Amino acid sequence: MIKTSAIFLFLNYCLGKKVDMSMVVAKIDWRQLYTFASRQALLGFCFDGIERLAKEFSEELKQNPMERDLLMTWMGKAQQIRRQNIKVNVVASKLYSMLREDGLRCCILKGQGNALMYPNAYSRNPGI
């Protein structure tokens, strides 16, 4: 079981905060982190953190590498999330344009606005 403090440390790291992840990376159970991220709809967000870990803590990752099948699965899910976000953004933009052409002032209240608060807006699960 992953310690809650390790999860919150990792989430802070994913938010872009400068956190020493060396001890966490050395001991983390990647499958448990994947399960947690999946249940919380944070797969894309956490994958961005993992990509950052690969750059900043490569030596620690060599000591505790993620299994290839898990990495490929996670990468695939992250790509699906990015594609979904692109589609939702296009649809929201078209809807906005249609409403404006009809003379309506509008504001589309969709979760995509929340994505702007993420370090990478395309990593937020669009919830479709």
Residue map of PLM features:
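Charged, compositionally biased N-terminal leader segments and the immediate start
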Residues: 1-12
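Helical scaffold of the NTase/Pol beta-like nucleotidyltransferase catalytic core
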Residues: 3-4, 16-110
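Conserved nucleotide-cofactor-binding alpha/beta core module
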Residues: 99, 115-118
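Catalytic metal-binding acidic patch
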Residues: 119-128
